Amino acid sequence: MDREEILQKIQEITADRLGVDESEVTPEASFREDLEADSLDLVELIMELEEAFGMEIPDEEAEKITTVEEAVDYVVEHQTA
């Protein structure tokens, strides 16, 4: 998957999980501030991303993912070819 496809998938998952319009899920959007996710939302979102992209995101790494762009960066860097 290229970066654009990963962004699109993360936008779809985030919009679905948080019940927001996909147009609000911009790369610079903060999960907590802009998209109003709480801690449980974030845990569930990370689990969905792990499943969607077939990867494990350790808790200490998940805590560093605060924006949509950071989620995209993480997936791009850690996806298996």
From Swiss-Prot:
It is found in: Cytoplasm. One of its GO terms (molecular function) is acyl binding. This is Acyl carrier protein. It comes from the Bacteria. The modification O-(pantetheine 4'-phosphoryl)serine is found at S39. Disulfide bonds: none annotated. Pathway: Lipid metabolism; fatty acid biosynthesis. NCBIfam families: acyl_carrier, PRK00982.1-2, PRK00982.1-4, PRK00982.1-5. Belongs to the acyl carrier protein (ACP) family. One of its GO terms (biological process) is lipid A biosynthetic process. It holds the Pfam family PP-binding. Its main location: cytoplasm. GO terms for cellular component: cytosol; membrane. Residues 1-79 form the Carrier domain. 4'-phosphopantetheine is transferred from CoA to a specific serine of apo-ACP by AcpS. This modification is essential for activity because fatty acids are bound in thioester linkage to the sulfhydryl of the prosthetic group. Carrier of the growing fatty acid chain in fatty acid biosynthesis.
